[in-house]
A protein has these predicted regions:
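Exposed acidic/polar residues on beta-strands and adjacent loops within beta-sheet cores, strongest
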Residues: 25-28, 43, 88-95, 133-134
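Short, low-complexity N-terminal intrinsically disordered segments enriched in polar/charged residues
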Residues: 3-4, 8-35, 47
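Short, well-ordered alpha-helical segments enriched in acidic and aromatic residues
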Residues: 41-52
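Stable alpha-helical elements in mature extracytoplasmic
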Residues: 26-29, 33, 41, 68-73
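A short gly/proline-enriched turn/hairpin at secondary-structure junctions
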Residues: 54-62
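Short beta-strand edge/turn micro-motifs at domain boundaries
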Residues: 109-134
Length: 134
């Protein structure tokens, strides 16, 4: 009986820790997103996409499915091979956050804005915007 109770507590702790991770103020959703932007890995980046999101590249804005957005990002990364990405500013509330960053890709610098929303027990990218600095 004691083993059953310990097993139940362990399983509950696993489920609760996943929810707590996203809401924990020390958890930074932008760490993995930044990593995949710097690597130019559209496949891994798209795991963070919402099912439907807005993607804007150089003033061309599209409401896209996750798969469409992945293809758009793959095309961008083919044209502009990333060398580095650095977050320069972050803000938001517990369920909505945004970050501004600088992407060095293809010999150019780009300003990247990322909006994430807490949905279905995890953060998802709702909008990603890539622009040339003005």
């Amino acid at each position: 009986m004691r083993k059953v109770i310990i097993s139940v507590i362990a399983v509950l702790a696993l489920f609760l820790s996943k929810d707590a991770k996203a809401q924990d103020s020390s958890y930074d959703v932008f760490n993995p997103i930044s990593k995949y932007l710097a690597l130019g890995d559209a496949d891994k980046l798209s795991a963070w996409f919402s099912d439907d999101l807005e993607i804007t590249i150089f003033s061309n804005s599209n409401d896209s499915s996750r798969n469409q957005a992945r293809q758009i990002m793959k095309s961008f990364f083919r044209s502009y091979t990333p060398r580095s990405f650095e977050i320069t500013h972050k803000a938001g509330r517990s369920n909505m956050k945004y970050a501004l960053g600088t992407l060095n890709a293809g010999g150019e610098m780009f300003v990247v804005t990322i909006f994430v929303n807490y949905m279905d027990k995890d953060y998802r990218i709702q909008h990603i915007k890539i622009e040339r600095p003005s």
